[in-house]
């Protein structure tokens, strides 16, 4: 607490003296300013001459550099512009030629479409004719194969019929032989067979 009171007392003392010192400084400054203004006015007159001299030297140097480099710069610039214009004209002619080619193609497009349609119809007819010929050939092959199968089936049926007829004939002959065969005839046959084996 004591410290705070001491600090406040010092601060009040300093502020009380500050206006007095500020007043002294402002009087001294005003006197210096008046002297400086007079001296500055004398120096300013001589400085204006040097400023103009520096300006004239700078303007002359810039004028010399511009005069020396401006001619070639503008010549190169105009040559570049001329070249760009020539390129533009060439591109314009190329674009016009392409546009004329497109117009010509568009004009011929109807004829091209009609030609393509005619060619497509001819190709379709040729394909249909080829398909008809192929179908006729396939039908002929199928008929020939069917005829061969029918002939083969007929031959097999005839063979089966002959075999069946032979089997029937054998059965009939067997029945006839059995009907004629008596036990005495059978014994005589067996004994004759046994004798032949010896």
From Swiss-Prot:
Task: Supply the Pfam families for this chain.
Answer: ATP-synt_B
Query: Listed GO cellular component terms?
Result: plasma membrane; proton-transporting ATP synthase complex
The membrane topology noted for this protein in its Swiss-Prot or TrEMBL record is: Single-pass membrane protein
The source's superkingdom equals Bacteria
Q: Where in the cell is it found?
A: Cell inner membrane
* Ranges that cross the membrane: 49-67
Task: Tell me the keywords, alphabetical order.
Answer: ATP synthesis, Cell inner membrane, Cell membrane, CF(0), Hydrogen ion transport, Ion transport, Membrane, Transmembrane, Transmembrane helix, Transport
Molecular function GO terms recorded: proton-transporting ATP synthase activity, rotational mechanism; proton-transporting ATPase activity, rotational mechanism
User: Which InterPro entries does this chain map to?
Assistant: ATP_synth_b/b'su_bac/chlpt, ATP_synthase_B_chain
HAMAP family tied to this protein: ATP_synth_b_bprime (MF_01398)
Subunit details: F-type ATPases have 2 components, F(1) - the catalytic core - and F(0) - the membrane proton channel. F(1) has five subunits: alpha(3), beta(3), gamma(1), delta(1), epsilon(1). F(0) has three main subunits: a(1), b(2) and c(10-14). The alpha and beta chains form an alternating ring which encloses part of the gamma chain. F(1) is attached to F(0) by a central stalk formed by the gamma and epsilon chains, while a peripheral stalk is formed by the delta and b chains.
Q: What does this protein do?
A: F(1)F(0) ATP synthase produces ATP from ADP in the presence of a proton or sodium gradient. F-type ATPases consist of two structural domains, F(1) containing the extramembraneous catalytic core and F(0) containing the membrane proton channel, linked together by a central stalk and a peripheral stalk. During catalysis, ATP synthesis in the catalytic domain of F(1) is coupled via a rotary mechanism of the central stalk subunits to proton translocation.
Which protein, by its recorded name, is this? ATP synthase subunit b
Q: Which gene encodes it?
A: atpF
């Amino acid at each position: 607490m004591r410290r705070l009171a001491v600090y406040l007392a010092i601060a009040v003392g300093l502020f009380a003296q500050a206006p007095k010192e500020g007043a002294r400084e402002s009087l001294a400054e005003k006197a210096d300013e008046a002297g400086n203004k007079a001296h500055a006015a004398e120096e300013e007159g001589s400085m204006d001459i040097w400023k103009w001299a520096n300006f004239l030297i700078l303007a002359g140097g810039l004028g010399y550099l511009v005069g020396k480099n401006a001619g070639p710069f503008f010549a190169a610039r105009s040559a570049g512009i001329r070249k760009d214009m020539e390129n533009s004209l060439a591109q314009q002619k190329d674009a016009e030629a392409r546009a004329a080619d497109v117009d010509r193609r568009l004009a011929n497009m109807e004829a091209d479409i009609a030609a393509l349609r005619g060619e497509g119809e001819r190709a379709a007819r040729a394909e249909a004719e080829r398909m008809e010929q192929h179908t006729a050939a396939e039908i002929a092959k199928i008929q020939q194969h069917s005829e061969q199968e029918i002939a083969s089936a007929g031959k097999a049926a005839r063979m089966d019929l002959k075999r069946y007829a032979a089997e029937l004939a054998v059965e009939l002959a067997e029945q006839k032989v059995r009907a004629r065969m008596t036990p005495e005839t059978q014994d005589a046959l067996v004994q004759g067979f046994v004798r032949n084996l010896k």
